[in-house]
Amino acid sequence: MMKNLAITLIICIILGGCFASSDKRIVDNAGKSKVPAGAGDATTLPKAEFDKYYKVSESFYDLYLKPSGFNGAMLVAKNGQIVYEKYSGFKTFELKDSLDMNTPFHLASVSKTFTGMAVCKLWEDGKLSIDDEVSKFLAGFNYPGITVKTLLNHRSGLPNYVHVMEEKGWDKDHGVTNQDVLNFLIENKKKLSVGRPDRNFTYCNTNYALLALVIEKVSGMKYNDFLRTTFFEPLGMKNTFVYAPELEHSVLPSYNWKKQKEPFTYLDIVYGDKNIYSTTRDLLKWDIALTTGNIFKPETLAAAYSGYSFERKGVKNYGLSWRLYLYPDNKKIVYHNGWWHGNNTVFTRLVDDSATVIILGNKYNRRIYDAKKLYTAFGNYDGDGVGGED
C-alpha cells in the first residue's frame, strides 16, 4: 500500500498536482505560505523544495480527504514553515459559515500533550517528581504503586472512567467533574477491576483526568490558568483555550458522518484528557516551541519522547503524553491522535526531519487518520496509517 501511494504522489508532483480544487488554500503571491506570528525562527525553504511538499500535501488532500467529505483544517509544515494550509467546510452546517484559520477545534486526545507537558514542566522546575506516588497529591487516593509517571505513560492499571462510571450506575443526568472521577475511584475501589501498576500499557482517559488535578494541587492554580500562563500566552496561542460548561453554546460544534450535530453529554466537563480547543496555526506554534527548546530542557524532552512499554514487539510505543513510532534506524514519530464525539484530530511531529502534519475535523471522518501516508514525503517512514483513539 505504501509503495503504491508513494508512486501516486510522485506522479502528482510531476504533473503539478492531480486535481484542481476550488477549496481555499492560504498561500502568498510568491507561492510561499507565511509562518504564524510568534512561532519562532522558521527557515525559508527553496522554492523547488516548497513546491514539492505543497504538491504532495495537496495530492494527499485531494486523494483522501476531499472525497470523504472532509470538514476541517489541514496544515503541513517543514522546518517551521507552512508548506500547505487548507480550510474546508463549515463551522455549522445549519448556518453554512465557513471555517478559517482562527476557528478553534476540539482537540480531543491531542489535549493530553498539553496536560502531560504541563506535568513535565512542574517536574523540570522541581515542583514534583514523576516517580512520586499520586497519593502524595490527591488526598484519599489509596492506590499504592500508582505514580505520576504511570499516569503519564498509561501504565497505572486504572479503569477508564468514560466506561466504568456508567457501568457502576452513575446518574447520567449529572455531569461528571474531575473531582467526581477521583471520588468515584476512592469510594468504589473494592468494586473496580484494577491492574497492577506498571505491569502493562492500557490507554486510559482516567490517567489524564487525575493529572489535571495533580497540576492544580502542585501549582496552586486552576488547570486552565496554569496552561494559559505557562503555554498559551507566552507562545502567542491566541485561539487556544480550555473548555468550560458556560462555553457550550459558543464553541465549535461537532457532527456525525451524516452531518447531524453531536450533543454534549455528562462526560463533557472533565478536562486533562480532552477539552482543549485550538487551531492548526496555534498547534504549529506549540510544535515549534517544543522543537526549538524554548520552554523545555533537552533531557525533559528526551524523557517525554522515550518509550516505556515493551511488552509487545514492534515500533509502536507511548512516552510521557506522546504516542511514538520508534524505528530500528533510531528515527521516531512523535504524535497524538484524538477522537471525541464528531471531532477527529491528528498532531504529528516528524522530529528527525523537522516536519509537522496537523489535521483537525469537526465532522466524524476516519480518513483523517490516513495522515501517515504523507510522512514518506519527508523521510523513510514505513508502515500503515496510524489509527484513531479516544
Task: Indicate residue ranges for each PLM-predicted region.
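Bacterial Sec-dependent N-terminal signal peptides
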Residues: M1-D28
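Catalytic loop of the DD-peptidase/beta-lactamase superfamily, centered on the K-T-G motif
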Residues: C18-Y87, E216, R228, E233, ...
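Short linear capping/connector segments at secondary-structure termini
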Residues: A42-P46, T92, D131-G140, V164-W170, ...
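Conserved beta-strand positions that form and line the central face of beta-propeller blades
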Residues: T44, Y87, S98, H106, ...
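Short active-site loop at a secondary-structure junction
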Residues: L65-A73, L95-L151, S193-C204, Y271-G272, ...
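Short, solvent-exposed turn/loop segments enriched in Gly/Ser/Thr/Pro and often Arg
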Residues: K78, I82, V134, G140, ...
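Solvent-exposed coil/turn segments that connect beta secondary-structure elements
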Residues: N79-Q81, K91-F93, S156-G157, L247, ...
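Short, surface-exposed loop or secondary-structure junction motifs
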Residues: I146-H341
